[in-house]
From Swiss-Prot:
Binding-site list for Zn(2+): 395, 398, 413, 418
Functional summary from the UniProt entry: DNA ligase that catalyzes the formation of phosphodiester linkages between 5'-phosphoryl and 3'-hydroxyl groups in double-stranded DNA using NAD as a coenzyme and as the energy source for the reaction. It is essential for DNA replication and repair of damaged DNA.
Annotated positions binding NAD(+): 29-33, 78-79, 107, 130, 164, 278, 302
Name of the gene encoding the protein in the UniProt record: ligA
Organism: Streptococcus agalactiae serotype III (strain NEM316)
Keywords: DNA damage, DNA repair, DNA replication, Ligase, Magnesium, Manganese, Metal-binding, NAD, Zinc
Protein name (record): DNA ligase
Amino acid sequence: MENRMNELVSLLNQYAKEYYTQDNPTVSDSQYDQLYRELVELEEQHPENILPNSPTHRVGGLVLEGFEKYQHEYPLYSLQDAFSKEELIAFDKRVKAEFPTASYMAELKIDGLSVSLTYVNGILQVGATRGDGNIGENITENLKRVHDIPLHLDQSLDITVRGECYLPKESFEAINIEKRANGEQEFANPRNAAAGTLRQLNTGIVAKRKLATFLYQEASPTQKETQDDVLKELESYGFSVNHHRLISSSMEKIWDFIQTIEKDRISLPYDIDGIVIKVNSLAMQEELGFTVKAPRWAIAYKFPAEEKEAEILSVDWTVGRTGVVTPTANLTPVQLAGTTVSRATLHNVDYIAEKDIRIGDTVVVYKAGDIIPAVLNVVMSKRNQQEVMLIPKLCPSCGSELVHFEDEVALRCINPLCPNQIKERLAHFASRDAMNITGFGPSLVEKLFDAHLIADVADIYRLSIEDLLTLDGIKEKSATKIYHAIQSSKENSAEKLLFGLGIRHVGSKASRLLLEEFGNLRQLSQASQESIASIDGLGGVIAKSLHTFFEKEEVDKLLEELTSYNVNFNYLGKRVSTDAQLSGLTVVLTGKLEKMTRNEAKEKLQNLGAKVTGSVSKKTDLIVAGSDAGSKLTKAQDLGITIQDEDWLLNL
């Protein structure tokens, strides 16, 4: 009996691979269903023999309570965007300056959700969302219901792979047909449907919706030499990879490929929003390294935005957490890039004046980067004596007089007690990239603020379950979850807190760099502008903004209050002893290493106290050079920087 179960699992997984991955089924649906039912019956009779890679794991109505946070072992970086051929040529020049013989891999940019899959001994252990690149959500049970994701690899590998989870157009249409029949609101586009499906707590719904994936990266160390090799290896493991790709050292040929795909993309069975161009050599990728936000060895070309005409019906003015007042146009609805658009940003008052935008105008609307609807210009030939738009003089939230500074393009409310600003600051503090307090969204912030229960971020930590229960719509179970999420956030690493404070010019990446350098929020608050400005990737603007923020008396009081509530001020990332052998040294790795992988070398250097960077400069203290070292070695020699080899590093 056990042998028959093993045979059925093997057969059904092979047939599923032929159907979902290879698009070449060798058995009929009825034959598959017959074998599947036989397996289900055997598993019901012999549950002790159920295999971890059984296809029956992909179905069922398991209801989850929520999704836990997941710390990625290997960060997921975003990509630099390009919107023109000129930007691609500039990227090519930057790469060729370091590596004249570099070739590129051009791949389709699938319009879905980035996911990370970790296998231990060949068995899928964790499937997670990208999140902020460092911390995502564990959605393993949902990803097990995606039919082309292997539950068990043929080899007993420990591997982490990355890819895009998407909803095919055919599946999207089927879902919306069902929603229409049930009188439910339809999904606007396949990407929204995929995102909503992956966040479903009922895994049975996920199984029915026929999501799919394309894998494109091995995040864990690999012995492969090129991106092309990686894709071939991923396919050999049973993953779906996209075959619409091109390898070329010529950006002209890459551009021709882009033009062809853009013309034909409507015929693809899934949505794409551009082409990703990567340096094909993994060794060159390592050499080129990363900026604070993105790899230097890749760029994402975004297709030009679709444009439609619409009429401006009215304009709403809203104030954000920094006091900037933003105009949003209400439009006659139009279909744009697969979405119904009825609102579009007008950016700021200077933009309105420059474009002479008026209520009643017919305007050209587009999606900036295929994401945010915006007004491009006015169709003057259709203007019919519309009145000039009335620019507000008073804040729409607090009624204070608005100001328009000479060096700014926007109107600004400078009242620090403006209700909308306070609510926006509170929502930002609790948001995913900041303190990540689950359940503490804008609607809850509004209720708490209106009930006079919170007025600044420290008030969040005063809240009790009883306070939350006084709000409309909050039951005991929800109140308890929110309270525990608040308490849990106290233990976050301090870069989350720093970002949550909403300091101008200080984003999440800069927050991490600052806390890596200073280790503690209090130490950062007392640091000089010069010491902050000297950190790679930052500069004078951020340093001045931090200095201005921390010298305020009310900020010092806020930090004292947060301390009294035991909110963590320490950076919880990897720290090294100041007496480590390479403590404080900036080191660059270059060339091909023979006895250790680049990741192993980088980790060893960091454990010895070094800061490993991707480029050689006057701030570089040491370079470790392997064979075939290129321009970085030459530059280090010109600058008189100490040069060591791989054996030196091994012997440390």
